[in-house]
Amino acid sequence: MLSNSVNNNNNNNNINNSNSNNNDSNIHKNVKKLMVASIFGGIMSSLIVTPLDVVKTRLQTQNTGSHINQKHVFKGTLDAFKKIYKNEGPLTFWRGVTPSLLMTIPSATIYFTSYEYLKEYLYQFNDTEAYNIYTVPLVAGTLARIFSASVTSPFELLRTNSQGIVLQNAYKNTVAMAASSSTATIGTIPLSSEQRFNSFKLYRDIVNNVGIKGLWRGLGPTLVRDVPFSAIYWAGYEVLKNKLMKSQIDPNFSRNSKSPFFINFIAGATSGTLAAVLTTPIDVIKTRIQMSAQQTLSPSLTPQQQLDFIKKNNSSIYHLKQILSQEGWKGLTKGLVPRVAKVSPACAIMISTFEYIKQSHIADDN
């Protein structure tokens, strides 16, 4: 009896070890598939929606200059598209696409892969529908976004500044021409070759002025914006996908079932739109903080004044007060239309492409 018991235990241990090894093997296989899916989806969405991101950044930062009235540089989204196309050329709409792609590859890989594995890990603790649909996406989405945003923050800083630099250069040109032309308008002056954006110079200036930590300028507001966005998005996506599948296609749909491309597309676009609308005010503040990285410290300032200057420009409260006092509540909604127009298709393209590649490749392996 004892011998049989020992043999049974050994057999069970061997089976468990075999299952564990198989699971580890599947995890390594799936990591590669998830990485391919997330990278491909991220690249596709970046190339398609970058023009909308450029317009959003311009609208959010056009009032950051001083000394002359910049309120009518761009009157709205369509006006921004027209003026940028007319005065700067169509390629300007893809300004920042290189740092955007550099950011997309590690960000999408870390974000989606982390989300998938955190989700599978959290599923072990409960198997109720409410837990799987609401709690798991909220927690997994939050943790995955914190990790990916922290890693890619320097690339986000570069992308934001490369898209907004033209506006501030145009402002400098306008000031120089103001004495000879009373009709000079910001956004209508062509840039000189010397004013092309230099990413290395930006990083060097930031490090020289505020140290290496300056490359993570805006990370706080980015997390404040992206963490709730991620939680809202994933919870909304999972809930909507679940409801659409059960009502339209499969009443017995579960988390392990496949969902078709168009269901993922609709759920991604809808949840992305909701999350974008709710987090736009934070996005405006984050953009202002990151654009302030271009401001250099005056050598005439004392060390304490320099420290105060840096703290002020890194403060979300300071920029919030500035926006409210100079632009009112509407200032917090600047760039809402292009942001939603960018985020909605980006979320739809990203998640539907990701799910399609993930499901097809993992299914092939199985």
UniProtKB/Swiss-Prot annotation:
Membrane topology classification: Multi-pass membrane protein
A Pfam family that the UniProt record links to this protein: Mito_carr
Protein keywords: Membrane, Mitochondrion, Mitochondrion inner membrane, Repeat, Transmembrane, Transmembrane helix, Transport
Family, per entry: Belongs to the mitochondrial carrier (TC 2.A.29) family.
Biased composition range(s): Low complexity: 1-25
Signal peptide region: none
Span list, region Disordered: 1-26
Solcar repeats: 29-121, 132-243, 259-360
GO biological process, one term: import into the mitochondrion
Coiled coil: none
Subcellular location: Mitochondrion inner membrane
Cellular component terms (Gene Ontology): mitochondrial inner membrane; mitochondrion
Keyword Transmembrane helix: yes
Gene name, Swiss-Prot/TrEMBL: mcfH
Entry keyword Transmembrane helix: yes
Its job: Mitochondrial transporter required for glutathione import into mitochondria.
InterPro entries: Mit_carrier (IPR002067), Mitochondrial_sb/sol_carrier (IPR018108), Mt_carrier_dom_sf (IPR023395), Mtm1-like (IPR045315)
Entry-linked PANTHER family: FI19922P1-RELATED (PTHR45760:SF2)
Protein name: Mitochondrial substrate carrier family protein H
Top-rank lineage group of the source organism: Eukaryota
Transmembrane parts of this sequence: 35-55, 96-112, 133-151, 175-192, 262-282, 340-357
Species classification: Eukaryota, Amoebozoa, Evosea, Eumycetozoa, Dictyostelia
